[in-house]
Amino acid sequence: VLSPQLLQTIHAPLVKTPGERARLRKFLERVNEAHYGLGWRQYDYAGYKVIGHRGGVNGYRSLILFDPRLKSGVVALWNSNTSQPGGLEFEVMDMLYGLPFRDWMELDSKPARTPEPADQEEREHAA
């Protein structure tokens, strides 16, 4: 268990990162500022301080975003090379804050994608 003082230190914004805000361009109506510090990103999300991190390696992705004041947030882990379900974290935060619904994941506006078979045997079976 980490002390509150240590959590405050590692979650403190150290560097303003306008490039991160640009990367999140589809969320700009709610992401007002982005910072980085000791492995964590800090965002001003619709006037609320939220902290998060995301990353991935071949075939696996993860994200975490939370509001330390509310002691609430979201964690998602998925096996994929795509960024989908990118936006899930913001849909959850909108629910926490009582903000109007936005389809941040764009599930209703993207055509369904056929998953790729996992190996050669499945590809041959699917053909």
Where are each of the predicted segments found?
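Catalytic loop of the DD-peptidase/beta-lactamase superfamily, centered on the K-T-G motif
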Residues: 1-127
